[in-house]
Amino acid sequence: MKSVEEQLALIQRGADEILVEAELVAKLKRGQPLRIKAGFDPTAPDLHLGHTVLINKLRQFQDLGHQVIFLIGDFTGMIGDPSGKSVTRPPLTREQVLENAETYKSQVFKILDPAKTEVAFNSTWMDQLTPADFIRLASQYTVARMLERDDFSKRYASNQPIAIHEFLYPLVQGYDSVALKADVELGGTDQKFNLLMGRELQRAYGQEAQVILTMPLLEGLDGVKKMSKSLGNYIGIQEAPGVMYSKLVSIPDTLMWRYFELLSFRSLDEIDSFRKDVEAGANPRDIKIKLAEEIVARFHGEEAAASAHKSAGNRLKEGELPEDLPEIELSSPEDMPVASVLNKAGLVKNAAAARDLLGAGSVKVDGQVVDRTFMLALGETRVFQAGKKAFARITLKAE
């Protein structure tokens, strides 16, 4: 096992916050494998790269010799996480949740080592709680404290309904840490309230409080909003190799460093050398190709990654549009100028680059050269080409 200092440096990589870092150091100094928990509610059947930020961190803990618990929230999934929601989420049936859970297990083991992963379902202990147990659990927190949570307070202030079962969600997630005796819990930055609940409940039930580690929410292909299937700015980990490759090489240049930090297993020194290469004049696309090949290989194998790269290169040489064209959805209250479309979709570095390409006659929409007066209308879907290598099928939806 690596030294405490070496472990801490790796654990800190990409992390937004560690609470409390001194407690983590104390736990590491014991020299015993820690129980590392991360929970996922199977509310949809497919995972995307945004989900893998946490799973990658779990793998890092595995490689450091710690015990990883991949918790499938089949019980909490039927409640629906209210984090960041302005309305009550419709609950799923147990059948829907369990069906989605099966696909999760097959997908996560493309990253995690199955031999070193404990897969748990929170219905295992939650279904065993008696009404008296639930009342004891609910007594550990007050309504006033619940309303300190930003999403609840906003809904309360605007007279939007908050269902009682939504108050139960953070309590149940916190109780999961009690049941699993977690030493560390991972979650996105939007989960901080729920993660802190775990610390409080562990103390209330006579356990040592877990350390919480929050990871950033990965931006989607637009480089602005968090990756989400509903926003259309996602890369699914079960997407075809060519589609995944095309999407990754089409991300904005500035976004690739974020993706390297949160998705790549390369060393920080190697990533820093890539950054210096770009600053010295290297083509950013060449660096994005390295990222795309690494991630496609992780989910589909080295051969598929090499084939995706070769196919993309052949199509570009022949001037053909890619068959696996990236699909991007943008939103706006009104029709959008072509320069804004190119910029927001990440087909160019910035608005100035879009204007330069338009002035040079190097922008095509559905195969036809357009100038800066072109507007993408609300509800339309068009194929955009910026220069020789940047392509995307873009849909403009009304906000």
Swiss-Prot record:
- Supply the EC number(s): 6.1.1.1
The compartments listed are: Cytoplasm
| Catalytic activity of the protein | tRNA(Tyr) + L-tyrosine + ATP = L-tyrosyl-tRNA(Tyr) + AMP + diphosphate + H(+)
One Gene Ontology term, aspect cellular component: cytosol
Which BP terms from GO are recorded? tRNA aminoacylation; tyrosyl-tRNA aminoacylation
> Known PROSITE patterns for this protein?
AA_TRNA_LIGASE_I, S4
> Where would I look for the motif 'HIGH' region in this sequence?
42-51
Domain S4 RNA-binding positions: 336-396
Q: MF terms per GO, please? A: ATP binding; RNA binding; tyrosine-tRNA ligase activity
Arranged from A to Z, the UniProt key words for this protein are: Aminoacyl-tRNA synthetase, ATP-binding, Cytoplasm, Ligase, Nucleotide-binding, Protein biosynthesis, RNA-binding
Q: Top EC class per UniProt?
A: ligase
Main location, first listed in the record: cytoplasm
HAMAP family from the entry? Tyr_tRNA_synth_type2 (MF_02007)
Q: How does it assemble?
A: Homodimer.
Looking up NCBIfam families in the UniProt record yields: tyrS
Per the entry, what this protein does is: Catalyzes the attachment of tyrosine to tRNA(Tyr) in a two-step reaction: tyrosine is first activated by ATP to form Tyr-AMP and then transferred to the acceptor end of tRNA(Tyr).
Put simply, this protein is called Tyrosine--tRNA ligase 2
Q: Which organism is it from?
A: Pseudomonas aeruginosa (strain ATCC 15692 / DSM 22644 / CIP 104116 / JCM 14847 / LMG 12228 / 1C / PRS 101 / PAO1)
Gene label: tyrS2
